[in-house]
């Protein structure tokens, strides 16, 4: 079944200058917080409590689902309501307020908590007082995490499951490749796989799949929960490597929580004054919109320059981990939107290929300084123009400039000093990905024990400060690089940007910017996409194939090539080509060739 691609709009201009509806600014919390001595400890305590609550919520959901799966009972519908009920089950609150609609589910969860979860971990419920408006945000975040896990990883896990369970049927990769594609598109497959399909597919795929698995997993991802558990159970019996069917929060460094106006009122406005008289807390909560300006003026320094923005205004919501703070802003022309009404969604920036431009549009680019840009994993971008000016931005450079490497070293030293590594190593014996109910119980006990032993270490402010510092210096590193582009190549430039990209993370390498870096460059400079076909394999001068350079031991040198055709007849010197520089020059030449002649050299045609 062919998937219809969304038709790209005709090229009109390089970028969409329309402003997004929302914007966030990340700054240190202490720079805008009023009455720091009294308010920051309250926020810190809440951050710690909610982080612990979220950790247990992930574990409780997984434990409850495994219990149902093991007993061959219907799995729960994992929506925000179910997650919110799980959160409430793990906490205590008074009996005032609106009762839950599904009392049967609440009672079932409470019973499971009392009989299974609480005795296992000796868990103490979290005090949920003054968190009424915060809990739905936590439920949404957890739901999004679970939802994304299914959408992003089910296909990958399904294909790996096929690899691991079809060894006895065929080892022919081409036959297996066709079988995988036909399975995903729900087409008839080779009869040699009939027994395999009868055994496994009913346990993996839901009924009434629409169009294809690729489409259906996006529409109703939680229908594939049973399949994820089944595949993991089969792999576990085979003693193969497992995947995570339902994610857990294993990192216990406190994370950000969302605070809105109602949450601020609940936290900092007492119900009664010193004399025992009722305050206006109830009145404020019943009329939040009219009082929100007054509330935030008493909580944050609204005279701070961060709030003075020409196009945006503060939208009465923050995210904080007690150290850093993300302020939510809304466009001023949308500030009076009605509750529930939709705001205009800014379309994702289209990166047009050079073939999308008409001859008239190409003619306007002839006086530009063309820059060839080769994106990659280790060298994030390597740029070069026809004058020989070059600029490179590497993953290692970014890691050092953002203090990422320094932070890793400090964390490792402190973990060794406090013997945290020894404690965490003990947990590695257990498997958090197991779907065996008893094995997962053992893991939960060991993980909870470890969390209690290390929680004081990870609650230290230094880890959250380092995370914020890494974010800040990472932005500074990018800004410095963007300014260097102008210094190196001038203002009137057109960047021919190679179309290299990866859809998944490369093994044994750190995560790096790819499309995100392209977006940042494109915001400031005009870029056009160039097909990279053969640009790293053929010489930038003679266009003949390059060969890897080998040392005296016959070992290929990383990213270093030689061109036998460009060797001088007089001195027989070897001509070396570095992969990135060679690609950048080829991309530059392809860009210029299309602008002036609307043709692609024969050697680079596909």
Positions of the model-derived regions?
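Positively charged, helix-rich recognition surfaces that bind polyanionic ligands
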Residues: 2-59, 65-74, 78-606
């Amino acid at each position: 079944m062919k998937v219809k691609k969304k038709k790209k709009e005709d090229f009109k201009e390089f970028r969409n200058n329309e402003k997004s509806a929302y914007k966030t600014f990340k700054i240190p919390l202490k720079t805008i917080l009023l009455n720091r001595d009294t308010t920051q400890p309250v926020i810190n305590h809440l951050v710690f409590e909610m982080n612990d609550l979220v950790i247990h919520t992930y574990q409780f959901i997984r434990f409850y689902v495994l219990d149902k799966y093991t007993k061959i009972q219907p799995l729960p519908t994992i929506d925000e309501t179910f997650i919110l009920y799980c959160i409430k089950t793990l906490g205590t609150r008074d009996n005032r307020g609106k009762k839950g609609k599904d009392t049967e589910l609440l009672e079932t969860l409470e019973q499971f908590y009392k009989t299974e979860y609480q005795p296992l971990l000796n868990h103490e419920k979290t005090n949920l007082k003054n968190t009424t408006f915060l809990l739905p945000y936590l439920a949404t975040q957890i739901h999004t995490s679970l939802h994304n896990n299914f959408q992003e990883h089910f296909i990958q896990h399904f294909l790996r499951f096929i690899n691991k369970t079809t060894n006895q049927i065929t080892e022919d990769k081409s036959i297996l490749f066709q079988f995988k594609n036909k399975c995903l598109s729900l087409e008839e497959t080779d009869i040699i796989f009939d027994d395999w399909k009868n055994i496994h597919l009913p346990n993996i795929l839901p009924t009434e799949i629409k169009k294809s698995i690729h489409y259906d997993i996006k529409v109703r991802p939680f229908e594939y929960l049973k399949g994820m558990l089944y595949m993991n159970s089969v792999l576990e019996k085979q003693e193969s490597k497992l995947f995570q069917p339902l994610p857990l929060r294993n990192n216990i460094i406190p994370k950000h929580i969302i605070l809105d106006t109602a949450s601020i009122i609940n936290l900092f406005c007492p119900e009664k004054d010193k004399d025992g008289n009722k305050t206006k807390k109830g009145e404020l909560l019943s009329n939040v919109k009219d009082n929100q300006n007054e509330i935030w003026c008493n909580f944050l320094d609204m005279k701070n320059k961060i709030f003075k923005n020409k196009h945006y205004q503060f939208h009465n919501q923050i995210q904080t981990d007690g150290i850093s703070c993300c302020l939510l802003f809304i466009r001023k022309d949308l500030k009076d939107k009605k509750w529930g009404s939709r705001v205009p969604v800014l379309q994702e920036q289209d990166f047009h290929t050079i073939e999308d431009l008409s001859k008239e549009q190409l003619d306007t680019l002839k006086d530009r300084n063309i820059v060839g840009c080769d994106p990659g994993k280790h060298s994030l971008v390597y740029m070069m123009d026809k004058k020989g000016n070059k600029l490179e931005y590497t993953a290692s450079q970014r890691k050092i400039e953002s203090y990422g490497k320094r932070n890793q070293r400090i964390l490792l030293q402190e973990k060794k000093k406090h013997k945290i590594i020894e404690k965490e190593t003990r947990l590695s014996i257990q498997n958090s990905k197991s779907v065996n109910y008893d094995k997962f119980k053992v893991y939960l006990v060991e993980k909870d024990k470890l969390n209690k032993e290390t929680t004081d270490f990870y609650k230290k402010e230094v880890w959250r400060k380092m995370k914020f510092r890494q974010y800040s210096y990472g932005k500074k590193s990018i800004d410095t690089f963007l300014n260097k582009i102008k210094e190196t190549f001038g203002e009137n430039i057109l960047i021919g940007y190679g179309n290299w990209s990866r859809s998944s993370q490369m093994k044994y390498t750190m995560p790096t910017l790819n499309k995100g870096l392209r977006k940042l460059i494109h915001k400031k400079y005009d870029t056009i996409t160039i097909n990279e076909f053969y640009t790293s394999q053929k010489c930038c001068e003679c266009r003949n194939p390059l060969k890897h350079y080998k040392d005296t031991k016959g070992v290929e040198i990383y990213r270093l090539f030689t061109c036998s055709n460009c060797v001088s007849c007089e001195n027989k010197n070897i001509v070396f080509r570095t992969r990135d520089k060679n690609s950048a020059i080829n991309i530059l030449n392809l860009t210029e060739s299309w602008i002036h002649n609307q043709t692609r050299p024969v050697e680079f045609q596909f």
